[in-house]
Amino acid sequence: MNVLLCSINTLKGLYDISGVEVGQHLYWKIGGFQVHAQVLITSWVVIAILLGSSIIAVRNPQTIPTDGQNFFEYVLEFIRDVSRTQIGEEYGPWVPFIGTMFLFIFVSNWSGALLPWKIIQLPHGELAAPTNDINTTVALALLTSVAYFYAGLTKKGLGYFGKYIQPTPILLPINILEDFTKPLSLSFRLFGNILADELVVVVLVSLVPLVVPIPVMFLGLFTSGIQALIFATLAAAYIGESMEGHH
């Protein structure tokens, strides 16, 4: 009886811990679901920036590209090169997915450094870059997982699952575990880097508010771009691996 009571108390303690939140959050009720309003607001802003800039740049395409059209053509060519390198000759259908991931993460990361989110007052909590929230990075990582499972099943059918027993069935648990660790590593890498960058800038601004934080902010912009590239490259690599076989 004592063992059973102890187990129940332990489970209750774990349940209580799972409900602990860091900081304050603003929630909306949509239907029967409770959603994180701060992430939705900042994500909508990022999506609006991407859609607005692309529409303005290419609404009247020219034979001789203008500055905006030329920039977006360069970005598209860059994303195509990344996709082709990681996926191979069948990269074409995956360019929109990889491009969407790269651009959303890139603009989200930069918005944390360039947009004055803090001046917008909310009833609870405060606004920040979408990728500063673990919910966003986990969602992006899960989308990537769905994408590479879909790519593998589309290319190989049920034979795709044969990779789990290659090169030997003994590795079955490890190969299964690998598919679970991929989204974890993607999400926590992106979340940790963006959160750490913003925290460093906030601390330096509070200590030395004039000159010192500026180089750190420029470094943060650089690392934010690198993180977007790493995420997109790994997503393309996982898709290419699922289509070609186990490496």
UniProtKB/Swiss-Prot annotation:
Transmembrane segments: 38-58, 95-115, 134-154, 199-219, 220-240
Localization per record: Plastid, Chloroplast thylakoid membrane
Tree of life domain: Eukaryota
Gene Ontology terms: cellular component: chloroplast thylakoid membrane; plasma membrane; proton-transporting ATP synthase complex
Chief localisation class: plastid
Keywords linked to the UniProt accession: ATP synthesis, CF(0), Chloroplast, Hydrogen ion transport, Ion transport, Membrane, Plastid, Thylakoid, Transmembrane, Transmembrane helix, Transport
Membrane topology: Multi-pass membrane protein
InterPro entries according to UniProt: ATP_syn_F0_a_bact/chloroplast, ATP_synth_F0_asu, ATP_synth_F0_asu_AS, F0_ATP_A_sf
GO molecular function annotation: proton-transporting ATP synthase activity, rotational mechanism
Keyword Phosphoprotein applies: no
Pfam families: ATP-synt_A (PF00119)
Protein family according to the UniProt entry: Belongs to the ATPase A chain family.
Free-text function comment from the UniProt entry: Key component of the proton channel; it plays a direct role in the translocation of protons across the membrane.
Oligomer and partners: F-type ATPases have 2 components, CF(1) - the catalytic core - and CF(0) - the membrane proton channel. CF(1) has five subunits: alpha(3), beta(3), gamma(1), delta(1), epsilon(1). CF(0) has four main subunits: a, b, b' and c.
Protein's name according to its UniProt entry: ATP synthase subunit a, chloroplastic
Organism placement in taxonomy: Eukaryota, Viridiplantae, Streptophyta, Embryophyta, Tracheophyta
